[in-house]
Amino acid sequence: MNRDSSRQSAIILAVIGILPVVWLGLLIAPSVKGGLPEILPSLLAVFNDPFHIELCGDSLKTVLVLLLLYGMGIGIYLSTRRNYRRREEHGSAKWGSAKAIDKKYRQSPPSENKLMTQNVRIGLNAKKHRRNLNTLVCGGSGAGKTRFYCKPNLMQTSNSSQVILDPKGEILRDVGNLLEKAGYEIKVLDLISMEKSHCYNPFVYLRNDNDIQRLVTNLFKSTTPKGSQSNDPFWDTAASMLLLALIFYLHYEAPEEEQNFAMVMEMLRAAAIEDEEDNRPSPLDNLFADLEMDNPDHIALKYYRSYHSGSAKTLKSIQITLAARLEKFNLESLAALTSADELDLASMGEKKTALFALIPDNDSSFNFLVSILYTQLFQQLFYSADHIHGGSLPIPVHFLMDEFANVSLPDDFDKILSVMRS
């Protein structure tokens, strides 16, 4: 019961108490003239015959005096009902105990908790304890971040989906079978042995033009080496316009099986300028010329015109810049991995799924794909929660980002952390 309702109940009881006070005043009124010696004996007679009331000249005065005394008593009582902390004038801080903290935050059943230490758990339903479930675990190499935090929490097999960043594939090897037996659907983005990986095609998750813009921005950010600064951002900006034109074309004009990065590379090769003096249009120019005849206001055409406004030498340099950004997609293994999609990211908030992202610990060449995966996964889960499930996902999604410093995260990751908890 909160403070307001408690005070309201006390006032109601005080008002009800007026009736017996008035009744008592009427009973003792005939004896008040004789003072206390007459009042006390009369009380015995009053209780023997409580309904024998005689009205007299002192009845009104007696009732008013008793009501005044009663009101003063109630006022003193209500004014002293405060949360006094006696003998704590100099503070009340003390060392907490693991048992007390665990009792305060744990929930039932035990599997529906996040393990903080061996003796302390915190429930996954944040609405009950009103605490943030985001956890930062710091420690040097060999401190036990994976062994004593990641693995025990995965072995809880709670009613939640798991997204695990797994350098070397150690976590998948140790707990994958356990999760599968617990009813999890296991999906793996394996950038160590790509031929064993589930396929992941970022194009599948492009719902609108804004998603395409985010994909291109994230791709350029995640393929930029840390700490590097371009003296002339023109080339990256122009290359991003060309990439936007290609992706917009595929998104709106190509069949689904051709919407992937392998086809982007095919289109880029079709734009190659062999001779700067040759003014003949390239196959890609012809493709966009046909598009202009059908739909001159097509968004892909707008970006292509912006890219194509330079000289042949400039266009060739822009193509080289973009080819350098996308050169990993020339590899057959990566092209095959991104040619289709088997991850179904949106379903992670609807059924128990464990998604492992395996990255080499000694090579960050393909980590940009994990960065794109995280960005699109956040977008898919937010959209599903807000537009399909009324604000929250049926199945909570728990991110375990082991060695996450090795992956380029979205620029607004701190904001995502602050809002995803709800």
Predicted regions and their residues:
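P-loop NTPase motor domains
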Residues: 131-422
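Basic- and hydrophobic-enriched, low-structure N-terminal and domain-boundary segments
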Residues: 1-143, 147-153, 195
